[in-house]
Amino acid sequence: MQFQNGSPENTDGRLDKEIRVYDFLDKLRVEYQRVDHEAAMTMEACEAIDRVLGDDTAICKNLFLCNRQETDFYLLLMPGDKPFKTKNLSAQIGSARLSFAKPEYMEKYLDITPGSVSVLGLMNDHEKKVQLLIDEDVLKDPYFGCHPCINTSSLKFSTKDFTDKIIPALDHPPITVKLPLPEEQA
């Protein structure tokens, strides 16, 4: 695995949703690096990719959640080493108990399949059905890493570009949350 700067020169065999991500970033003039790899379905599978992206890059868990009624949807970005406890998040956002949303909602709102969840999928949520939630620790590293809506590539760009260019262009104002570290949980 090695870094490439920007979008792939040859887009043969790449999905339209992946190419739309590169076009979106290029239009925003976001400088980014890309690494292509085997499908990464879990955080464990991402460990080798994490090493390529570097210690200065926030690699997050991206959880697609909903309320019990399946009327409110959330995309939570959180550090990979933090455990997720629904009660900690529910209290902060004033929602009843949250659970993982069904894959069909992920495809409907984000044009993403399980294992490929990415904040960049919000560019496909034209109805603004998904609320972006970001754990404050995600924004502490100088760089941010995510999939381009497909789990066979990973991207790295500056956290400053993420907060100053990408999030505003996604038009999904985030709610910042603080999830406890394992040692802080009772």
Name each model-derived stretch.
Residues M1-A186:
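Extended, low-hydrophobicity, polar/charged segments
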